[in-house]
Amino acid sequence: WTKLRAFELYEYERVVMIDSDMLMCHNMDELFDRPLERGMIAAALACTCNPKQIPTYPAEWTPRNCGYALRPHPPNDTRQLTKPTHRLINSGVVVLEPSQEQHDKIHTFILQHPERVAQYRFPDQDLLADVYSERVQMLPWHYNALKTLRQCHPDLWNDDEVRIIHYILDKPWLLGPAPCGGHTHLHSLWWNAYASLAAHPATLGMTRDEWAKEVALHVRGI
């Protein structure tokens, strides 16, 4: 639940929460100015296609139930969201406005629904989907470009539109730079970015020794 403490950053009017397994491709500052009603969050849908057929995923996670199959995307009318899976979000990118009210709302839900919370497969995003079930503004896919979307929904994906890539499932830094099946292109983008930063760690305010200890030590295949 640590990442949900972003709702406690009361000194900020708005926060864009981003997971660490992502690669920024283009500026996303417009998310700080995007209209958002009080008490709402903004996030992209979860892809429920389960292309690797992971047996521990919910049984309803199938391509026919995936919200990304809906057109237009994102849906203009919430009446299109006819299945529970259509309202699931991926919490890789969440636009939120921190407040005591929102923090208490989340905390209260956890305390009042312990059995449901215990069944969550993806705790933080399942919780947010429940708490904000009618208060989510759906972001376009490119603000949280799940790498599997490129294969699961090729009609939706456009490389030029991607703002940030989300390396769900297998991580390029754990697999090494070798080709990775259908994800080779997206993984190579991460490795290119890594190589650029590794060559000039001073751009991050790091010495080469600091880079080796804090970053390179955790990357395989180099």
Language-model regions, residue ranges each:
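Glycosyltransferase catalytic domains, chiefly GT-A lineage
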Residues: W1-I222
